[in-house]
Amino acid sequence: MLRKPNKVKLPEYLITGKLCDGYDFCLVGFLLNETGVPKEVLNKIPNEGYYCYNIDVEDGNIVYNVQEIMEKIYNINQEQLACLMEKNDKYDLMERIDLLQKVLSNHDIKYYL
């Protein structure tokens, strides 16, 4: 089931795919935004039958709540995982998003900006 974010946020990107156990998943990125989420954007986000992992972006720092999905499904090294999970001056926001794309690119993933 889709877990909706507690705060009002504007989706930045949406990644969907299939877990190794057959479940669908939904990886949704949000930027903090006081105006709310447009209905046409919400309509693109899958509903039941999907796992949802929120990505919070605030003040230039990005925090991914995707460790479980990364460890369970994708064989990525600790350096890549640390880049995605922690504040790291070596990578800016776009580099982290780019790395996430590369990590997921070898799988049956749909990526929306």
Annotate each predicted stretch with a short phrase.
Residues 1-25, 32-113:
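Domain-length accessory/inserted modules outside core catalytic folds
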